[in-house]
Amino acid sequence: MRNLTLQRGRRQILSQLSLDLRAGELTVLLGPNGTGKSTLLKCISGEMAAQGEIRLFGQPQSQWPAPILARRMAILPQSSALSFSFLAREVVALGRLPHASGKIADEVIIQRCLQAVGAEHLADSAYTVLSGGEKQRIHFARVLAQLDEHMVDSPQTEREPTAAAPKLLMLDEPTSALDLSHQHQTLQTAQRRARQGDAVLVILHDLNLAARYADRILLLNHGQIQADGSPEEVLTAERIKQIFAFDAQVFRHPETGRLHIS
């Protein structure tokens, strides 16, 4: 991304923002409410248009046919409204629509993705009766299923017999409705995707979760990246005070050695 700029009325949402997302890395995007975090994800996905340049997997965003790009990039929004009485497994199956892998393969993938989010027992439950956290996990399974692909796509060809091309997974506050164990399960799953070679971008508000799981943290404020680096480099008491207006204590846990913010 180069020089992304987006203005709504008199409000500058993104201002000359430049950023590279790297394969094999879990990047956490932090910032106060209303600073453009969700907007940035929508610009990357193509849902919103901004001035500037966005390239996906080395190609201009505009050159990617939507059905092909859907096999390489998936986004989990903050909320996903769905009022139809689908079963949970049918919601996850929506992630397979860009593919032509066949019913048998899709069923295996759907089951695997439900297991990845700890929701296999919900497979035959009606989506509309699930709790908010359960719905969030089902939609996470859906985007995982969307990226589960044994072949690789490029703008020029429908299929190429290579399995190494990275994908882009974007998650907008994926832990907001989850209990403690499922928060960690979700981020551990995202972390595994990064370890497998994908680029993963996650919006969080919990600084301790960010410190624990991020390879890289981006701090967004006033439409610009204010800091970019490791958790240790970005999450300093001075910077937290500056951006979040909060006097935080930042230290390493004496037993685990993990960075901790309180």
Curated annotation (Swiss-Prot):
Root EC class: translocase
Organism: Plesiomonas shigelloides (Aeromonas shigelloides)
Protein name in the entry: Hemin import ATP-binding protein HmuV
Coiled-coil region(s): none
Top-level division of the source organism's lineage: Bacteria
GO molecular function: ATP binding; ATP hydrolysis activity
Keywords linked to the UniProt accession: ATP-binding, Cell inner membrane, Cell membrane, Membrane, Nucleotide-binding, Translocase, Transport
Compartments (UniProt record): Cell inner membrane
Amino-acid positions noted as binding ATP in the UniProt annotation, renumbered to this chain: 31-38
InterPro entries: AAA+_ATPase, ABC_transporter-like_ATP-bd, P-loop_NTPase
Bilayer topology annotation: Peripheral membrane protein
EC number: 7.6.2.-
Listed GO CC annotations: plasma membrane
Disulfide bonds: none
Keyword Calcium part of the UniProt annotation: no
Domain ABC transporter stretches: 1-247
Family the entry assigns: Belongs to the ABC transporter superfamily. Heme (hemin) importer (TC 3.A.1.14.5) family.
Assembly and oligomerization: The complex is composed of two ATP-binding proteins (HmuV), two transmembrane proteins (HmuU) and a solute-binding protein (HmuT).
Keyword Cell membrane in record: yes
Task performed by this protein: Part of the ABC transporter complex HmuTUV involved in hemin import. Responsible for energy coupling to the transport system.
